Amino acid sequence: MSEMSYSIIVAEDDADDRLLLETAFRETGFDVHLVFAHNGVELLKLLTSPKRSFHPRVILLDLNMPKKDGRESLKELKQHPELKKIPVIIFTTTNNAAEISRCYDLGANTYVVKPDNYTDLLKVVNHLKNYWFETASVSEH
């Protein structure tokens, strides 16, 4: 499977953060199809649409979004028979032990605090590429 066939769905309400993520993926050479949802309602609608043309390898999920926040979305994802198998990475500015624990209890696969500078964001994207994609590809064979 080539990297080009990978899809990541990003649930993020902040336009600047979406643009930074898109730029970081491109700049690191991580050629992946990014699908953006602006809130939890849109995320679940995209994922459950019978016309969905992508199959995300990973979901990057912000916690603080309008309409349906990341916690509610995570809970619904993990209760859905098909969607519960997609790894969910919480990607948020919220950094406290109780929230991290709560997200793991709800079924998050990992929790990443958004870096406050672009250099660290590039490191996070490289980690995603190296761990969630290249490692998974080796184990698929």
Model-derived regions: residue spans:
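Conserved active-site segment of CheY-like receiver
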Residues: 12-13, 91-95, 115
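Acidic, metal-coordinating helix/loop segments flanking the phosphotransfer/catalytic sites
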Residues: 36-58, 122
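Short, glycine/charged-rich "phosphate-handling" switch motifs in NTP-dependent
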Residues: 109
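C-terminal output helix
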Residues: 42, 116-127, 135-140
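Active-site residues of response regulator receiver
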Residues: 61-62, 92
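Receiver (REC) domain active-site loop signature in two-component systems and cognate sites
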Residues: 65
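Conserved acidic segment of CheY-like receiver
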Residues: 5-16, 21-25, 59
